[in-house]
Amino acid sequence: MSLSEPIFRMEGISKRYGGAIALKDADIAIRRGAIHAVLGENGAGKSTLIKIMAGVVTPDEGRMLLDGREIAFASPAAANAVGIVCVFQELSLIPDLSVADNITISHPPQRFGMIDRRAQRRIAEEALTRAGASDIHPSILVKDLPLSRRQMVEIAKALARKPRLIILDEATSALTRSDVEKVFAVLKRLRAEGMALIYISHRMHEIAQLADDCTVFRNGRSIESYPAGTKTDQQVVELMIGREYNNVFPPKPAHRPEEKPILSCRELSWGDRLSGITFDIRPGEVVGLGGLDGQGQRDLLLAFFGVLRDLKGEIAIDGTQVKLRSPRHAKSGGISMALIPEDRKTEGLMLPMTVRENLSIAALDRISRNGVIDRAAERREIDDLFKLLAIKAATIDMPVAGLSGGNQQKVVIAKWLMNRPRIILLNDPTRGIDVGTKQEIYLLLRKLADGGAAIIFYSTDYDELIGCCDRVLVMYDGSIVRELEGADINEHELIGAALNIGGEHAQQRIAP
């Protein structure tokens, strides 16, 4: 088989869940030695497609061919056995096991009936090196790694299975920029070795850098396949959403709000993670936190939300100094703060519970009367939020796990809006969701700010900081090194400040 011929085909694939059509007559052909990008909004059918490829679910109609021969998978193990391995967006790692245990979990090396730890470590080290993550020690527990490093372990685990076709579902959404570059280098090397790769991402610039072939899905159908680089980003997005695509970011206000600050901090420090943080935010502002990942941005959000202990410095709400004792205190009526977490699966949602239960739990005090939930008030609140965020769900009593990723993220945001917060903290809120949902979230943030909310927005995506924020505070090594505003919020300035490149702006503090 030549490199230009498909190694794997799916023809006329359909899948239904009850009355809902997840896939309808979908086709795709994957070549050896090529990276094939699969694009589409959340709910377009991409997840069902790769679950069928990976043996997680079986199609109702259609056929799959590997090397020209028709095949069917009864389980993920059957797909793995022929060399098809998937790295899902929801990590499959077991937190309480070591990195080496996770990498070799399907086929641990044995000696005398016991796991051969020396061989296991060698396999893990080789896989981590191949994944560009040789700095991760095989014996460390997965739960002790940050999310970005866990994703690298997941990729190493897939490579340890020696795949012929590897499927990556939003594999870079949790990664730092340096890790993304390492993954790109790995994928390009695997392509050069003749491996077939399927790459799912909502980041258009990643598709432009990596892909050889592209297929767009919409409403469960494969809309068009084309060689990468033959369509503009706007044309691709219009294929994805089925309508004309306008500017993704809403307009910013012409003038900075003049009200008194709603939130202020002075010389806020925490161990060696935060140092001398000083700034104000006013009602109606969207203030971004920039900088390389891991420079204290998440710690700062947790400090404001009452999670961190032994803080030094001052925090004031409406000019009155406060000591935020807990998240419950931070979200209480006098302060009225909300935190949209980074990982919706583990921090933002209770997946087995219903949409209704997930939404109501953050506002029980407000929608209860004498300890009993007022169902009429609850329903009114939920209906209003469904309209505001355009949440798509068959019913509010369905498990939230059954929603698409974009709608799950909308539920996370809606949950915190149930409390009508005045201060909203967002930790990379659009990670792993489609461009259409991102645009809806950007519009919502500006609408909330226009309504008087103060928003602190951490994002690893420079385009979001540029498009959404009135000001950006760039952090480096736990400190704010530069404030950018207006035309200065551009990629050149953001990168320079993130690297703390010298000149008069280096180590610049924000004046009270």
From Swiss-Prot:
The Enzyme Commission number assigned here is 7.5.2.7
Q: Domain of life of the organism in this record?
A: Bacteria
Enzyme class, spelled out = translocase
Which Gene Ontology MF annotations are present? ABC-type D-ribose transporter activity; ATP binding; ATP hydrolysis activity
Keyword Cell cycle found: no
Question: PROSITE patterns in the record, alphabetically?
Answer: ABC_TRANSPORTER_1 (PS00211), ABC_TRANSPORTER_2 (PS50893), RBSA (PS51254)
Annotated coiled-coil segments of the chain: none
Reaction catalysed by this enzyme: D-ribose(out) + ATP + H2O = D-ribose(in) + ADP + phosphate + H(+)
Membrane-crossing residue ranges in chain numbering: none
Task: Please list the residues that bind ATP.
Answer: G40, E41, N42, G43, A44, G45, K46, S47
Q: Which UniProt keywords apply?
A: ATP-binding, Cell inner membrane, Cell membrane, Membrane, Nucleotide-binding, Repeat, Sugar transport, Translocase, Transport
Among the entry's GO cellular component annotations, what is one?
A: plasma membrane
> Mind telling me which InterPro entries this protein's record contains?
AAA+_ATPase, ABC_carbohydrate_import_ATPase, ABC_transporter-like_ATP-bd, ABC_transporter-like_CS, P-loop_NTPase
The UniProt entry, under Gene3D superfamilies, shows: P-loop containing nucleotide triphosphate hydrolases
- Residue ranges of the ABC transporter domain? 8-244, 257-502
Relate the protein's function as given in its record.
Part of the ABC transporter complex RbsABC involved in ribose import. Responsible for energy coupling to the transport system.
Q: How does it assemble?
A: The complex is composed of an ATP-binding protein (RbsA), two transmembrane proteins (RbsC) and a solute-binding protein (RbsB).
The UniProt entry's sequence similarity note says: Belongs to the ABC transporter superfamily. Ribose importer (TC 3.A.1.2.1) family.
Protein name as it appears in the record: Ribose import ATP-binding protein RbsA 1
Gene for this chain: rbsA1
